[in-house]
């Protein structure tokens, strides 16, 4: 079952390399995955569910990679480390994920389907960095990091260097602007 779901997710990501998200049909994804359509529809009703599951898979991989990494006492360093691990995991899917982000701009309904998944990822990153997200200051930290994450991902899409040097520099600057805030209110 898990293998089939990953196959379907990867099929969608492969199609996204050359096709706009809104033009992709479920039967095309299922055909690419080479699974029987009856079996496939047991897993996913629509392509939005596939995307959500894909991003949950990325979250799980990120969480597993961080098990062996000892977090420092510096919040900024932790956020930087976790973010860059996520970027490394997403790297093979960069063009496809960019296509999804571009589609969100033009398809508000897609945003409505994916926003919970996005905020779940932000919450996970903050939790992994031991940043409290309790009300009221916690919500502010949450929103600030969501903006940093989203804007840095946008920069990453335009960073074609092998080691994501430009992205790392931008992330470091943006986290640096809020470093004191994250530490003081934690």
Question: Where are the language model's segments positioned?
Answer:
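Amphipathic alpha-helical interaction segments
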Residues: 28, 81, 99, 140-148, ...
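Amphipathic alpha-helical packing segments from all-alpha helical-bundle domains
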Residues: 108-131, 139-150, 179
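Generic hydrophobic, amphipathic alpha-helix propensity
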Residues: 3-12, 29, 54-58, 62
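Helix-turn-helix
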Residues: 15-53
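Hydrophobic/aromatic residues within well-ordered alpha-helical segments
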Residues: 54, 58, 62, 82, ...
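C-terminal peripheral helix-coil segments that are non-catalytic and often amphipathic
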Residues: 127, 158-186
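Hydrophobic alpha-helical connector segments
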Residues: 53, 67-95, 99
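Short, amphipathic alpha-helical segments that act as regulatory/interfacial helices
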Residues: 150-153, 157
């Amino acid at each position: 079952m898990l293998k089939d779901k990953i196959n379907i997710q990867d099929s969608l990501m492969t199609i996204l390399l050359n096709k706009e998200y809104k033009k992709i049909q479920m039967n095309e994804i299922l055909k690419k995955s080479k699974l029987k359509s009856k079996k496939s529809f047991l897993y996913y009703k629509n392509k939005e569910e596939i995307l959500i599951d894909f991003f949950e898979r990325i979250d799980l991989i990120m969480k597993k990679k961080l098990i062996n990494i000892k977090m420092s006492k510096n919040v900024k360093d932790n956020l930087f480390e976790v973010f860059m691990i996520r970027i490394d995991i997403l790297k093979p899917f960069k063009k496809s994920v960019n296509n999804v982000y571009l589609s969100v701009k033009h398809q508000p309904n897609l945003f409505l389907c994916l926003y919970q998944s996005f905020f779940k990822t932000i919450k996970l990153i903050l939790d992994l960095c031991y940043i409290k997200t309790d009300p009221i200051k916690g919500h502010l930290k949450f929103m600030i990091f969501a903006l940093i994450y989203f804007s840095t991902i946008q920069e990453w899409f335009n960073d074609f260097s092998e080691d994501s040097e430009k992205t790392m520099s931008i992330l470091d600057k943006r986290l640096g602007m809020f470093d004191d805030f994250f530490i003081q209110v934690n």
